[in-house]
Amino acid sequence: MEASLLKKNQSIELTIEDLTHDGSGVGKIDGYPFFIPNTLPGEKVTAKIIKLNKNYGFARMENIETVSANRVEPPCAVYSKCGGCSLQHLSYDGQLEFKRNQVEETMKRIGKLNVEVPETLGMENPWRYRNKSQVPVGFVNGKLTAGFYQKRSHAIIDMSTCLIHNEQGDFAVQKTREILAKYGTEPYDEQTGKGDIRHIMTRFAHTTGQLMIVLVTTKERMPFKEEIVRDLVEQLELTSIVQNINPHKTNVIFGDRTKTLWGKDIIEDTIHGIRFAISARSFYQVNPLQTEVLYQQAIDAAELTGEETVIDAYCGIGSISLCLAKKAKHVYGVEIVDQAIQDARANAELNELANTTFETGKAEEVIPSWYKAGIVADVLVVDPPRKGCDEKLLETILAMKPKKVVYVSCNPGTLARDMKILTDGGYVAKKVQPVDMFPMTTHIEAVTVLHLN
């Protein structure tokens, strides 16, 4: 069939050749590509065209004529509707290979780099891994419910469990939902801006078993607040109940004010023997088992002897910094969020690690000022957001010339771009190691070390 004859709502037959970075299958008709969710390479499918652009189209899978050996039945009852997961229909071995291929292809296409990409480091059990849940509250069929948003919408799915949340947090969400419904709590309405409760959040500490519930409300006063807290304490094993007040008409989850309603202000967890105090709003990795794997890769790559000065750009609450401080002469950390820096200093004190300095600011501004003041890193660690490293920071790295740059990435595209700049500037990378921090989703973390040539 010629691509020029295609029309919306038409049924087409095609073979899926590849997966995109977001997990959709790609098949072509007369060289014209279609993106089709919930399909896998090698599958011959019938699909209905839902949108046609000049150079590509979108279709919805109607039937699979030839099924991939990697296809599995998704165990989640709401998988087809929910926006939380996107790869449950792909076997876990298939997911790990998909992520490895994504990294390898991105290194070649964007970075023009010929580096080794070993097998993705995955989980023995890729379920129930998330230590944090943030669940919107709303009305579904006239009753209060808490669940994830449907794909590409803000309609809430009424769900009894989430298979990637840890059991304790999952159970706590359901109990909290029941208690709120018991007292007739009114969910927040995004359209009108009315209602009392916006989100239920849970945080669970894997190593200590401590559990925090956060109620995100529209105002400080909330009907039956004391009774709700009493019931939560009676029915759940909790360390902390916190209220966050967000009065703004926005889809941002948190407001600026947080108060503890019961118990402690924080819960405590450990990574590689380092203790971390985690507040309601602290940034903390959501997969504790794989965080240990990811950080071990960074620790091994740094090859510290105790004599090195380390700079950790984008240090957050100091999670990588403090793991490295056990083996380094001194670690300097910088982070743009002031509360995270306060947390990092508190965590350094908690672990009696005096060989650390933390400063609030942009990495691309603070690190050049350190360099001018004579602070030169032997090892520089970057763990940037999805947009990658700022250009000015990369220029400073090339001027400072640390012996090693350890790069922890959550976006293979910007990792490849930044590696190209560093390798053009005299660094050499031999391999990029993918780590699966988020099974059942398309998110990819990777670690590499670049040596000064």
From Swiss-Prot:
Disulfide cross-links: none
Keyword check for Lipid biosynthesis: no
Pfam families, alphabetized: TRAM, tRNA_U5-meth_tr
Keyword Transferase: yes
Main EC class the enzyme belongs to: transferase
Annotated binding of [4Fe-4S] cluster, by residue: C76, C82, C85, C162
Residues engaged in binding S-adenosyl-L-methionine: Q285, Y314, E335, D383
The enzyme's E.C. designation: 2.1.1.-
Protein name: Uncharacterized RNA methyltransferase lmo1751
Organism: Listeria monocytogenes serovar 1/2a (strain ATCC BAA-679 / EGD-e)
